[in-house]
Amino acid sequence: MVDLSKMTKWDMGKLFDFSVLPKQSTEADIRRGCQIAKEYNCKAFCFSSSYWTPIVAEELKGTDILVGAAIGFPFGQQTSAVKAFETEEAVRMGATVLDNCMN
């Protein structure tokens, strides 16, 4: 069990992910989300589209914050083959953790 009374604010950040999930998010929204994740020392920064993976990987380079791409977001209605391709592409572009939306 974790004794929260003995944790610093910096250490506590690792208990949380930070995410920007709206499909209408802009590059500025994603970059700002990365800055917030760094400010609070989050475990991961998650986003709704693999499209943002290279930008997030660039923003988080040199940190231990995980690059969290969503696969099949938001409804998981894609076929397994499409999700497999999306997974491979996200990892190739720099994702270090994946959030797979099941159907």
What is each stretch, according to the model?
Residues 2-45, 52-103:
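Alpha/beta enzyme core
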